[in-house]
Amino acid sequence: MVNKEIAELSVLQSITTTETITSPSNARVRSTMKLRDAAVRRETGLTLIDGQREIQRCLTAKKEIVEIFFDADSFASLSDTDKKNFELLLREASAQHASLTPLSTRPFSKIAFGNRNEGLVAVARFHAGVL
C-alpha cells in the first residue's frame, strides 16, 4: 500500500512545481481567503470557484483560471476513478496555464466553503458584465 501512495503522490508532484503549503497563515492562503469578501473580489477581478464540477465547467468554457489549490492530503483517500478525474482536471488546468498549488488539510479548510470539501478550489479572473 505504501508503494501505491508514493506513486500517487509522484503523479501530483509531476503536475505541480511547488511545495505543499502546510501553514494556514501562509500569505497565499490568507490572500485567497480574502476573496470571500465581495469588495475584494470586485477590486481584484478574481473570484473563488469551489468544487470539481464547477472548475471543470470553467475550464471547458475557457475561462481564465489563475490558480488551483488542491488538498494533497485527501488525494490518497479518493477512489481510483476519482483520483483519475482529479488528475485529469489538474492536467487540463495546467495546460491552460493555471498554477497548481498543493495544500495540506488545515490550510485547505481555510479556503474551502463550509463542510463541502471536494479537494479543489480555484481562483479565476472574471469580467463583470455591464447592467
Label each PLM-derived region with a short phrase.
Residues 1-115:
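N-terminal positively charged helical leader segments and presequences
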Residues 115-131:
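Acidic/glycine-rich phosphate/pyrophosphate-binding loops and surrounding catalytic core
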